[in-house]
Amino acid sequence: MKPLILPWRGRDMPHAVLDINRGCNIRCRACYNQRPSGQRTLAEVEQDLSAMVQARRLHTITIGGGEPTLHPQLPAVVAAVRRHGLRVALMTNGLRLDGPLLAALKEAGLDLVLLHVDGGQTRPDLPDVSAEAVQRLRLDKARLVDRHGLTAGLIVTAYRDQPEDLINSVQLVLAHPELRYLVLTGHADFEGYGEISGSPAEGLRARFVGGSNQMKMEHFAALFERNFQARPFARLPSKGLAAYNAWLSYRAVSGQGTSTFLTSSLLERLAVRVLRCLGGRHVFLHVETPRAALVQVGLNAVLGGRMGGLRHLLNGPLAMKYIVCQQGPTPDAQGRLSICGDCPDAVFRDQAWWPVCLADRIVR
């Protein structure tokens, strides 16, 4: 079957980013934060949350920044999100993560820790930026998170000139039970765009068109097909003048040292509709037991997915692996930007949704 088209539009978008601070304790090659250091108070966070749940039927909120672990009341922020009946993920470089903080975040209700560890970072715990050192640090951080009862995933910036890092990160997630999620964010030339004008509703325009080395979805798809014989599970179309897949989702099942990439079937198409009807919102962050994964793999194969997944059913405990590829804002020759349709990774400012990767650069 063709990839499932994610029905996330308007108020039915199930995800957003809660932006709680600016300032960071490392430096990244492709950072899009532009505002000076500062943090939202708990009262301001509560106001943000109230506005966000009114504007979207949210299922999951991801806490970001800046580096959110620098916020002195991060566990209280997590608890505030949970009080709205939402799942909570945290984007962090992991530098400040330790046992006491992870225990506090677990108690507050955190579900998922997305660790951003890249070779393009300048950070004190990565003096050696070799591929082996980066992979080792990613796994060490994931195991620390897992030991404290939290689900771990990775955020990796994907560069066209470094395809081996994408391949390595996928292999790492497939091979290790401590890792369940991988978000691959395609590098875009944010610095080269300069100031951005307009709005997501009316259209966005960059002052300059930027460089020509953007990581686009055709590059992601080719790498997955060539290295993993994987086809997309689901897709999210772009919004703007250019038509492309802003998100591609891949799903794999792993067990006993082997992995198989699945394709969507009638099961997932029905599940999307049924869960939306029963819960009043779409599901964003999937959390299932090994037994549920076994049932899902079996039904997926029977109802039109990839039959190769069946070979895992007798291999003991199974784990689903979720991988998302994201193409950044893409300019045409006049600087007009195409973005994710109703961007899932949007922040709520001035009573409107703004793509998190552009929000600091848009002149309003």
Task: Tell me the role of every PLM-derived stretch.
Residues 1-7:
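A short, compositionally biased domain-edge/stem linker segment
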Residues 7-44, 55:
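Canonical Radical SAM [4Fe-4S] cluster-binding loop centered on the CxxxCxxC motif
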Residues 24, 28, 90, 351:
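Conserved, mostly hydrophobic/aromatic
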Residues 37-40, 267-271, 362-364:
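A short local loop/turn or secondary-structure capping micro-motif enriched for an aromatic residue
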